């Protein structure tokens, strides 16, 4: 029997990590965001109809280590000392909960978390509005920013919308 994989819940998280190895800086960012125990599969930008937004703590309780978990993720890495890295996901909630909303991902160098968050919201809002011809019910973002240390170690910054099926 084939079942549809339509998420019922979503939570938002972010993290930053540093390490001499790029891959391990990504792992450290996942740990900081509390999503390192899952096999993450990135998906595009649709917030399913009737998808409930829950806290990170509530969402994590419903997931198991090793589980394949779908997410919308913004990710940026660098080992350039002093460079600021910023990631954000933005969300546009539908006016009618029987319709879908949008989640955007955005990342940039040398941009504040506030500016990246505003840009992610603008993207999600634009995708929603061009489809519905109306403003979303609500918008928000989960931005994260960090600066590469002088050691030249790799820094990775992530923001994610994590789905619970």
UniProtKB/Swiss-Prot annotation:
Keyword Disulfide bond: no
A GO BP entry: arginine catabolic process
Cofactor(s) recorded in Swiss-Prot or TrEMBL: pyruvate
InterPro entries membership: Pyr-dep_his/arg-deCO2ase, Pyr-dep_his/arg-deCO2ase_sand, Pyruvoyl-dep_arg_deCO2ase
Modified residues annotated as Pyruvic acid (Ser) in this record: 45
Disulfide bond sites: none
Keyword vocabulary terms for this entry: Decarboxylase, Lyase, Pyruvate
Enzyme class (EC, first level): lyase
Marked site positions, Cleavage (non-hydrolytic): 44-45
Pfam families attached to this UniProt entry: PvlArgDC (PF01862)
One GO molecular-function entry: arginine decarboxylase activity
E.C. designation(s): 4.1.1.19
Catalysed reactions, semicolon-separated: L-arginine + H(+) = agmatine + CO2
Cofactor note (record): Binds 1 pyruvoyl group covalently per subunit.
HAMAP family in the cross-refs: PvlArgDC
Protein family per UniProt: Belongs to the PdaD family.
The protein, known as: Pyruvoyl-dependent arginine decarboxylase 1
């Amino acid at each position: 029997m084939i079942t549809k994989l339509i998420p019922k819940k979503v939570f938002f998280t972010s993290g930053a990590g540093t390490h001499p190895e790029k891959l391990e800086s990504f792992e450290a960012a996942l740990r900081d965001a509390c999503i390192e125990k899952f096999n993450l599969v990135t998906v595009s930008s649709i917030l399913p109809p009737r998808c409930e937004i829950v806290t990170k703590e509530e969402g994590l309780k419903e997931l198991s280590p090793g589980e394949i978990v779908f997410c919308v993720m913004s990710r940026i890495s660098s080992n350039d000392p002093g460079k600021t890295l910023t990631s954000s996901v933005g969300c546009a909630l539908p006016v009618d909960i029987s319709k879908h909303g949008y989640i955007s991902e955005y990342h940039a160098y040398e941009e504040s978390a506030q500016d990246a968050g505003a840009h992610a919201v603008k993207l999600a809002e634009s995708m929603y509005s061009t489809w519905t011809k109306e403003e979303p019910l609500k918008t928000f973002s989960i931005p994260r920013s960090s600066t590469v240390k002088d050691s030249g170690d790799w820094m990775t910054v992530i923001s994610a919308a994590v789905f619970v099926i």
